[in-house]
């Protein structure tokens, strides 16, 4: 890399460094900058219950998730057998992707600026979805809100869960960080 080239920095990561970190240091009086909560990873999960009867449904879900995240999904398998669902231990029932570093920041930027505004009747994310340890989870009911998904080629609508994992020790720290980043969490 020559001296004139600049290193790629995700837009949301730059915002985190320039706006979120100083705001959190001021609000919570951190003595050490390493105490400031940061995003560790984002896990995107698609549960495909229909995969028990039709494995093609799972293959299509994997294709959708690969297009949305830009990363090869991992197949998730049943941990227990459930006779009511005709499910055996070890059967494939979903897929997930773990995003870190630049791909995590780019995906979160895409969710905030493109996907969530396209959700029908969107009134903001639930503020009670924090887990008590600073992590935040929410769901998106339709994969078609992402621009990578071609609406005409969708065989059925599938939802997904998105879990934002942080180093925050409390929900208040994580709430302030995610709000400053631009995540549209509605008021309590």
UniProtKB/Swiss-Prot annotation:
One GO CC term, this protein: ribonucleoprotein complex
GO biological process, one term: translation
Any one GO molecular function term: tRNA binding
Keywords: Ribonucleoprotein, Ribosomal protein, RNA-binding, rRNA-binding, tRNA-binding
Annotated InterPro entries: Ribosomal_uL5, Ribosomal_uL5_bac-type, Ribosomal_uL5_C, Ribosomal_uL5_CS, Ribosomal_uL5_dom_sf, Ribosomal_uL5_N
Entry keyword annotation includes Ribosomal protein: yes
One Pfam short name: Ribosomal_L5_C
HAMAP family per the UniProt record, alphabetical: Ribosomal_uL5_B
Subunit structure: Part of the 50S ribosomal subunit; part of the 5S rRNA/L5/L18/L25 subcomplex. Contacts the 5S rRNA and the P site tRNA. Forms a bridge to the 30S subunit in the 70S ribosome.
Family: Belongs to the universal ribosomal protein uL5 family.
Function: This is one of the proteins that bind and probably mediate the attachment of the 5S RNA into the large ribosomal subunit, where it forms part of the central protuberance. In the 70S ribosome it contacts protein S13 of the 30S subunit (bridge B1b), connecting the 2 subunits; this bridge is implicated in subunit movement. Contacts the P site tRNA; the 5S rRNA and some of its associated proteins might help stabilize positioning of ribosome-bound tRNAs.
Annotated protein name in UniProt: Large ribosomal subunit protein uL5
Organism: Aquifex pyrophilus
């Amino acid at each position: 890399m020559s001296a004139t080239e600049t290193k790629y920095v995700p837009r949301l990561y730059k915002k985190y460094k320039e706006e979120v970190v100083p705001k959190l240091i001021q609000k919570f009086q951190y003595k050490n900058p390493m105490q400031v909560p940061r995003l560790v990873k984002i896990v995107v999960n698609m549960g495909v219950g229909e995969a028990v009867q039709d494995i093609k449904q799972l293959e299509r879900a994997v294709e959708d998730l690969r297009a949305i995240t830009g990363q090869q999904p991992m197949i998730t398998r049943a941990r227990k057998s459930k006779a009511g669902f005709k499910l055996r231990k070890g059967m494939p029932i979903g897929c997930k992707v773990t995003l870190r570093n630049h791909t995590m920041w780019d995906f979160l930027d895409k969710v905030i600026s493109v996907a969530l505004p396209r959700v029908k009747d969107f009134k903001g994310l639930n503020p009670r979805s924090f887990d008590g340890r600073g992590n935040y989870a929410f769901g998106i009911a339709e994969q078609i809100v992402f621009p990578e998904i071609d609406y005409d080629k969708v065989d059925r609508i599938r939802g997904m869960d998105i879990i934002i994992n942080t180093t925050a020790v409390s929900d208040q720290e994580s709430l302030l960080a995610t709000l400053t980043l631009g995540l549209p969490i509605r008021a309590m």
